[in-house]
Amino acid sequence: VKVAAAALALLAVNAAFLPVAWAKDNRTSNTAPVSSASYATQAPIVMLKDMDSGAILFSRGADKRFGPASMAKVMTAYVVLDLLKRGELTRETKFSVGETTWKKWNSSTGGSTMFLSPNEKVSVDDLLKGLITVSGNDAAAVLAVGIDGGEDAFVKRMNAVAASIGMTSSRFGTPNGWPDGGITKVSAADLITLADRLIRDHPDGYARYFSIPKLQHGISPDGRPIVQANRNPILGRFDGADGLKTGHTREAGYCFLGSAERDGRRLIMVVAGMTSAKARRDEAQRLMDWGFAARATAATGHARRGSTSASRAAGATHR
């Protein structure tokens, strides 16, 4: 009996020191802000990782699956960068913008576009710039068709690559994250994994494509060049910010997968479910500020988990 009691006591002590990230979050309040040390947030989905130490500095709703909207384009970018790295593709390779693809993804759909023209031949380099800088749905589709002959075949490749890098909760249905009846779903934890792997596996590609301030491509009806600013809400506003992608649907709200580096220390973050573009930007900046101020070591960087919000309307806009 004494031995059994001692064993139970030892298990209890060990359990007390398990990372909080391993514990299930059973709190269900949808209204109270989450506090961890000096940080508090109303965001239903938040995750912040110190990339170098691996410490999860803050986590809330990180395993909840949701539609990522244009953040799915980071997966498309990873696939393309992987093909470039393996020599199966070059930046100079040109793909033609087919009539079917153009009709499906030009600006009349209401989605983001880099303003490709029908039958235009565009380099992989320019398509990647359009994909990331201005969130071009057309760029994603042209890459998919050019690489695999069709969007469906490319999506199979996306899902295979996602599984191979440890994205265990994610499934993609389109190359650009356009609403597809609930097929495309990710988790914040998987998005953090994707960003981490992209930055580690393709540092040159990350540096080349993810922090371009603006992109000029296409001609407006009045003959002027079309110039669009980068959609990243903290690029140029937050010291060290250098990627990755925004997203927006009515289901997921305003979302952002972002990264910044200061003094050799890199943080990766996800926020989702924000009520406006401004709220998304402000939350991202505040979370990053808090993260860089926090001490991040493997010993002290266990996740702090908070309440999750389950109520969202299904939905439809895409940026």
List each model region and its residues:
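Active-site-adjacent loops and short helices of periplasmic peptidoglycan-processing enzymes
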Residues: W22-A189, I199-R200
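Bacterial N-terminal signal peptides
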Residues: A6-A16
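Enrichment for repetitive, rod-forming helical segments
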Residues: A9, V80, S311-R312
